[in-house]
A protein has these predicted regions:
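Active-site loop/oxyanion-hole signature of alpha/beta-hydrolase fold enzymes
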Residues: 5, 50-91
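Conserved HGGG/HGGXW glycine-rich cap/lid loop of the alpha/beta-hydrolase fold
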Residues: 8, 13-58
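Flexible "cap/lid" loop of the alpha/beta hydrolase fold
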Residues: 105, 114-145
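Short beta-strand/loop motif that positions the catalytic acidic residue
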Residues: 206, 212-214, 218
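Acidic catalytic loop of the alpha/beta-hydrolase fold
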Residues: 216-221, 245-246
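Short alpha-helix in the alpha/beta-hydrolase fold that links the catalytic acid
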Residues: 222-230
């Protein structure tokens, strides 16, 4: 855990060394639910930073007058400032995916790439969220979808995830009766965040490389929503076969293999271009990334002095189908953005 300048407590886990990768968890969970996945991702050459969002895990709630999803993204940004991380790949699952979209749109120059795992986003999802409080039929459909998705996952995930989504619906249905804290505050922030299309278009316009991975059998956020996210953000889209909403948690080996596959493809291309812009000779040189993207006296170094990670065990195998390939932005333009951000502040043009 760390404390920000204003005293706000934030839960953080750090592991590995290399390209900073910030991970944001799903609704009602915490960073700890993903540690089996993230320890394996760290072994691929990443400095993994998992952050508990407000009201989850070890992170304290936000004040009542800071209940927007943008306020939650701002807390993550301030956490990165405190840790001394200049730029990072930002990844999120479910609610964390929606929060990742907000963060990338707010500070695009600090985001090397975006990875969205079954993100709670897309025009269809936004429309469902907008009508859920007014339509008993939509509430029933949401509950049915959640239960259907849980049926395909292991029993403990069925119980846990069904509980989370029923609690979310309860929070929405009771409106202002419940205090906007913890789970209720996060659920309400999602429900009140409006359409994310404009934010996805910022990602497109700023040419932030984005990869969308979505379970083919996700009944909570249907694959149609992932297609809409990819179209709006100009993202590369993969359909993960035999995967439901919580596949990252239930099968962390497959989750880690999906990141490895990205490194062999779209994400590897992004990092090669970024390495060239930063003067890194070998994009797989984890020490070089560490020097360029993490401040020498950064707090994150004290949290991970031995570059702790569990290492890769028996590799899983994920079945990913490429559905949409992003229109490649001009590499020179994106590289210029990377170089400009990492220039000393007193050397940047006013």
């Amino acid at each position: 855990m760390i404390r920000l300048d204003d005293g706000h407590q934030v839960g953080v886990s750090v592991g590995g060394r290399g390209v900073p990768l910030v991970f944001l968890h799903g609704l009602g969970l915490s960073r700890r639910a993903y540690l089996r996945l993230l320890s394996r991702v760290a072994a691929l050459g990443f400095l993994v930073v998992a952050v508990d969002t407000p009201g989850h895990g070890d992170t304290h709630d936000l004040p009542c007058d800071a209940g927007e999803l943008g306020d939650r993204a701002d807390l993550v940004i301030r956490t990165l400032d405190a840790l001394g991380i200049e730029q990072a790949v930002v990844a999120g699952h479910s609610m964390g995916g929606r929060l990742t979209i907000h963060l990338a749109a707010a500070v695009p120059d600090r985001v090397l790439a975006v990875i969205l795992f079954d993100a709670a986003a897309g025009a269809s999802f936004d429309a469902a969220v907008a009508t859920v409080t007014r339509s008993p039929r939509q509430i029933l459909r949401t509950i049915t979808g959640a239960m259907s998705d849980m049926y395909r996952d292991p029993f403990w995930m069925q119980v846990a995830a069904a509980s989370r989504y029923l609690r979310m619906l309860t929070a929405v249905a009771l409106g202002k009766i419940l205090p906007p804290t913890g789970f209720t505050g996060a659920a309400r922030a999602i429900m009140q965040s409006g359409e994310c299309t404009s934010l996805l278009r910022v990602i497109r316009e700023r040419q932030i490389p984005t990869m969308v991975l979505h379970g083919a059998s996700d009944a909570i956020v249907p694959f149609e929503s992932a297609c809409e996210v990819a179209d709006d953000a100009n993202a590369t889209l993969y359909r993960v076969r035999d995967a439901c909403h919580s596949w990252l948690i239930t099968d962390p080996r497959r989750g880690a293999d999906s990141v490895r596959r990205l490194l062999d493809g779209a994400l590897g291309d992004v990092l090669r271009h970024a390495a060239e812009a930063l003067g890194v000779d070998d994009w797989r040189d984890i020490a070089a990334w560490d020097r360029r993207l993490v401040e020498p006296d950064a707090l994150v170094r004290t949290l991970n002095p031995d570059h702790n990670l569990l290492g890769m065990d028996v590799r899983g195998r994920v079945d990913m189908e490429l559905v949409r390939r992003a229109d490649h932005p001009k590499a020179a333009r994106r590289a210029a953005v990377v170089r400009e951000f990492l220039r000393p502040r007193d050397a940047r043009p006013a």
